[in-house]
């Protein structure tokens, strides 16, 4: 049962790892959705093992930008607000190909508010964990072909899509 659950979670994560490839396409219909506030904070962001450093400002601005890039395309009459907390990250360092190839990851907590109802849509924050986009040097890890900033952008875009 544990293997089945782990397999299903991996399929969900792989599906979310397409980054910004679809931003030129028409947005997926979300009804009357409009993102009014896109608040991102990183008060307790934890740097994972074997990770390159990133400042709180880098984390906040990159995640906020990726959310805006994806959700500012919607202009429906129903207003929603996102509250996002960056909880942790790993920005892969170059490894040893085929022996040690660290992967990048980003962990966020998301709360959504409905403006008309004046309340949260989710009582507890929804935790989102995303991995680097597969196909970007997966054998050697993203630490070789991508800078820390490029990895963070890719992770943020994956998070916005998930």
Identify the residue ranges that each predicted region occupies.
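N-terminal, post-signal-peptide region of Sec/Tat-exported proteins
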Residues: 53-79
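C-terminal motif of bacterial Sec signal peptides marking the signal peptidase cleavage site
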Residues: 12-16
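A structural "domain/chain start" motif
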Residues: 17-61
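Short secondary-structure boundary motifs at beta->alpha junctions and helix caps
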Residues: 47-53, 119-161
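Bacterial N-terminal signal peptides that target proteins for export
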Residues: 1-8
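Surface-exposed short loop/turn segments
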Residues: 74-124, 133-145
């Amino acid at each position: 049962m544990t293997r089945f659950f782990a397999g299903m979670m991996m399929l969900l994560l792989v599906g979310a790892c397409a980054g910004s490839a679809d931003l030129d396409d028409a947005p997926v219909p979300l009804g009357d959705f409009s993102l009014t506030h896109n608040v991102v904070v990183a008060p307790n962001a934890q740097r994972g093992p074997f990770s390159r450093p990133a400042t709180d400002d880098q984390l906040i601005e990159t995640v906020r930008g990726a959310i805006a890039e994806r959700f500012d395309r919607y202009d429906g009459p129903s207003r929603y607000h996102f509250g996002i907390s960056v909880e942790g990250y790993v920005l892969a360092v170059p490894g040893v190909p085929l022996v040690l190839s660290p992967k990048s990851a980003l962990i966020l907590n998301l709360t959504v508010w409905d403006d008309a109802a004046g309340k949260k849509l989710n009582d507890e924050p929804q935790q989102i964990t995303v991995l680097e986009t597969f196909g970007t040097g997966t054998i050697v890890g993203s630490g070789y072909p991508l800078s820390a900033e490029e990895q963070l952008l890719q992770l943020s875009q994956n998070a916005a899509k998930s």
